[in-house]
Structures are given as structure tokens and as C-alpha cells.
């Protein structure tokens, strides 16, 4: 019987992995389907050094540079998630929907996010259709309609892929798709960087960069795995007046929000670059470039990026972990934190602890994200510039999160086997 259950468990995991890989392959195939009617070679040559396109390419796996069917990628969905989550904290009716209506409320919030993503994708696709006008062979309103419809449908498909991966596959769908898009561009990135710097690069430069990135990877794994264990005592233990040898703990991660603050902050950072493409006022464009990293003075950009990561770390953590809910659950289980009174005192203790952990985790995320920019500014070393702290955080963070999800899935199935 146990052998049969184990084989079913392994087959279920294999099915999830195969399903995830299938959707990943489909998302990559759509990236290489070009929109007809565009002079893609001329377009690529004109935008190869555009920071806005470079950023969007990270999220679309190169689809934006070639104006593929999936050129918008997961960006509209991410932006929609930010908008809806901000609205949820600001609008009482949405906040009530999320906190008091359980799974039904969550489904309504998800549906609202989809609608906002659809509108956002439509707006972006119309903007792109006007942006590529100089490179279109026969530009007219029919082309605008066809291209906008194609890009919007492509973005909605990517959104559906990401949701299906999260629900029926392995890993977090949006993060995993961004991860695949980043690593798909690594070979080309490494080749171009080596070719552009092989005449100037020194052996010491390579050693320094490899050392820095190695330290960053170790640090990212440390921050992803860091946990503060809070001892919990049950009513039975409390009645005895002492803790048992087998102490229970409430684990709080140092970085509750994973790589999502980085993704959200990056999505916001693209707005100044996008607006700079649209405005004609030179002074306003100069001000916008101070926030998109293309200005020679990057201090304001780095401060803006740093602040966004801190904000989204607190914001996203507040969405996924509510100290008041944890306090209520402990009370229902007739348990309490050792040395802390149940109820309001427990909520305040958890909130204080969570704030400290989030601050430390956010500081580290922000530091890792801006380190490559600081090194480039101080040393003028730009080797592997495209693989910045943001990309590195996403690559390592998603790998760690996905492996942990697989382990959790296997453990949960083992518990099911024991119960049976």
C-alpha cells in the first residue's frame, strides 16, 4: 500500500514539473513569433541601447527587442498586482473583501487584478503600436488595432500561464517566468560583454568580479534561508509550569516577501524611462532621467531604488503575514509565545519582531540590488553589467524558493502517507 502511495506521489510531482516545463516552453516560443509588418532589423538597431527596452527585455526574455507576440510579458500583470494591492490597503470595501470573506474574497481580488492587467496591457500595447510607427511598412489604424490586440492577447496568455504554474505546477508562476526570461538572455549577454571588453579587461578585474558575485550569491541564499524561531508554549506545558524538551517554534523568515519587492520596484522604475520617451520638454526629460539610471549622476536613482525596495518589502510582508491573525490562531490552538501574554501583547510582539526582520531583510535586498551600480561608478568596471543585482537576486531567489516548494510538497505528501 505504501509503495503504491509513494509511486502516486512521485508521479504527481513529475506531472507538475512536466506541466510547468510545458508552459515555460510555450511562453518562450511566443517570444520568437514576430509581429508582421515591422522592420525588425531597423527597430532593433535603433533601440539596442535604450534602457527602457533593456529593462522590458529582462521580463520578456528578449521579446520586446524583437516585438514578439509576448513582447509585453508579465509586466502588465505585475503592475496590476501593485495597483490592486495598493488599492486594497486604501479602499475599505476592498480591504474588507480580502480580510473577511476568505477564499471567496481572495478570488474576487484575483479577478479584479486580471481586469486591471487587461486594461493596462491594452494601454501599453496601443502605446507600443504608436512607438514603432517609424519602423512599420504600412502604418494605419488597422495596424494599430491588430498589433494592440495581438500584444494584449499575448500578455493575457502569459498571465494565464503564470497562474496555472502557481496553481497546478511547481513554483511561483510570475517569478518563475521572469527567472526563465533572465537566464535565457545570459549566453548572449556574456558573449557581448566579453567581446566588448576583452581588449581592456585584466585578470584582476575578472577575479574581483567573480569574488563579488560569489559573495552576493552566498548572501542571497543566507537571507532567503534566514529564520528567527520564536518559542511557543501550549496550555498543557503552561499547566506544568515548564517547557518540554521538545519545544515548538513559530518560524519567521528574515525575508518574508522573497524577490517580489525587487520585481515590484523594478516595475515602478521603468515608469520614468517610459515617460521620458513620451515628453518633448527637455528639462522634464532630464528630470525623469535622474530616476531611470541613465543620467551621469546616479545618486538620486540609487536612493529612489533603495526606497522602493524598502517600501515594497514592508508592503508585501503586510499582505502575506498578519500578526493579528497569527495571534488569533495561536489562541485557537491554546498556545502562546513563551513569556508573552496572549491577545494584544502577542500581536504587538509579533508586529515589532516582524518589523525588525523586514527592515534587516529589506536593507540587504536593497544593498545587493545597488551594489553593481556602486561598483561600476567607483571602479568604471562594467563587465557583466547586464547581470545586475536585481537579476542575480531574482535568479538565486527563485531557485531557492522553488526548491523549498518542492521539498514542502514532498513533506506534505509524506504526511498524507502517514495519515493513511
From Swiss-Prot:
Please indicate if the UniProt record lists Cytoplasm as a keyword. no
Q: Which residues cross the membrane?
A: 17-37, 58-78, 117-137, 141-161, 170-190, 203-223, 259-279, 300-320, 357-377, 378-398
Keyword terms, alphabetized: Chloroplast, Membrane, Plastid, Protein transport, Thylakoid, Translocation, Transmembrane, Transmembrane helix, Transport
Task: Sum up the protein's function in the record's words.
Answer: The central subunit of the protein translocation channel SecYE. Consists of two halves formed by TMs 1-5 and 6-10. These two domains form a lateral gate at the front which open onto the bilayer between TMs 2 and 7, and are clamped together by SecE at the back. The channel is closed by both a pore ring composed of hydrophobic SecY resides and a short helix (helix 2A) on the extracellular side of the membrane which forms a plug.
Q: Which family does the record claim for this protein?
A: Belongs to the SecY/SEC61-alpha family.
Q: Which NCBIfam families match?
A: 3a0501s007
Describe its assembly: Component of the plastid Sec protein translocase complex, which is composed of at least SecY, SecE and SecG.
- Which protein, by its recorded name, is this? Protein translocase subunit SecY
